Amino acid sequence: MITRRQELDMKIFCSEQIQTDYLQIGRREFCMSLIAALVAGPAKLAVSHDAQTFQLRYIVGSSMYGRMALTDVLSEVRNAGAQHIDIWPEHHANHREQIETMGHEQFAAILKQYQVELGILTHYDLGPFGLQDEMRVAKKLGGSMVISGSRGPGNLKGQALKAAVREFIEKMKPHIAAAEQMGITIGIENHANSLIDSPDAIRWLAEFTPCRYLGIALSPYHLAQDPVLIAKCITDIGNCLVHFYAWQYGQGCHKKLPKQLELMQLPGRGEMNFVPIVTALKKINYSGWTEVFMHPVPRGIPIMPTAAEVTSEINGVRNYLELCLSREIERTPA
């Protein structure tokens, strides 16, 4: 039986016909597939996926839950189909601060209680040159990645951009060396109005970096909303893709909107078709985390009123992405 929540999700998912260069899915066919997937639930999607060598590996971003108690967030991670947590600080959340308040030992105990592992410490507040202390904390608590934005002039193009990216990598080398020593990966997000904010900048970062301990945390939100372009960016950088945000522009995230419009940042709710994107992830055999993501307005609040509702939205996106992947699989010859 389809729940009322699933019925509402289905109406949103079926609101537009999905078309790509890879295949065309008409509204009726897509909706019928989605009905079957929703009735079966995530378990059936996972079963069909198990037959394939490629799977999306999910991580939960704590900022999706705003400033809720960390225990309430950790209790939802497994329900959201994940095993790892990405911890965010103020002003998007305050879970990094909550860890310091409770102490590292208590945090480790709560992780164990809920059978969750630390994956990432996100720190746009510190910037890429201020992450070494957090690398040590991540290592101590079992994490393997820190994420930040880039530093350098924005709005550059051509050779000026290439030179600035090369200079940024040179400045990052001591931090890359520290990351290598600790076994921590540094993810740099492509963020609007920053040095690394375009496909060219992303490709040059991938070209100039040793990749293993520094790579791109790719945010489709901050790129042109062209799934084929985003897919090409993914295949171009290959194993320099270290993190993927399942996130689109939708109606944006800078002004207060009705909730249903705000949620259009989520894959499956907005207009962008993610089939070419997951196809590209499969093509490069992407093994990093996929983080279902959006920004609420104002920052620091949960994307939905309750933790269970936040998790439901995350699972709706997971169902959509798995359906996109199944469409890619169906078109691939055995």
Give the location of each predicted region:
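Histidine-acidic metal/acid-base catalytic patches
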Residues: 8-25, 31-41, 45-57, 68-80, ...
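Vicinal oxygen chelate
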Residues: 90-92, 97, 124, 255-262
